[in-house]
Amino acid sequence: IQQEKGSKRMGKVLGIVNRKGGVGKTTTATTLSYLLSKEGCKVALIDFDGQRHTTKLCGVTAPEQLSVTIYDILKCIVMNEELPDKGSYMIRTETGVDLIPANNKLDNFDKLMCDTDFAEYKLKEFVDTIKEQYDYILIDGMPKMGTAMINVMICCDSLIIPVQSETLAVEGMAEFLRAFHRIKSHANAETQQEKTKQCQRKQTDKKEIC
């Protein structure tokens, strides 16, 4: 996995998404970023969820005191302003992962994007500016369908969808994937693969999932 010294980095973008919370999305994002970093990859982790669980799990105890977050960065893009210096927002975690944090300002994301041209591409515009600095960029998305989720879908190269192995959860995932394909069919971007991760498998669930 590790890139050769001096070689161009892959900049592969992975979106960890589900429109339902409590399915292991944040755990998947933080654990995978740690494992990739442990293998020698240079990894960035973007907390794109207003609940800011990823930010807290990475050791930020007071997210509301952060002066620059992913929301502020995207606001600069919308306003056509110069992006903040990387050192003002990037947090190097104990695991060697570069965290781009979130706080409750992200709850205003949909309002920020209202009446914005090409609103679905704003996250991609930012990620493209850092892509060649990393082997992998992981995005922990919001657990709801909306402009923020669409931004992640368009931005990423691959999706990882944590899902519980129970009937209703699988049916919900199927609906999510149908929505995803509709969005991608109208977007000028392609996701190379979709990955489904079964989480919280119940021993009592004896039904096969096909």
What do the PLM-derived regions correspond to, one by one?
Residues I1-C210:
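P-loop NTP-binding core
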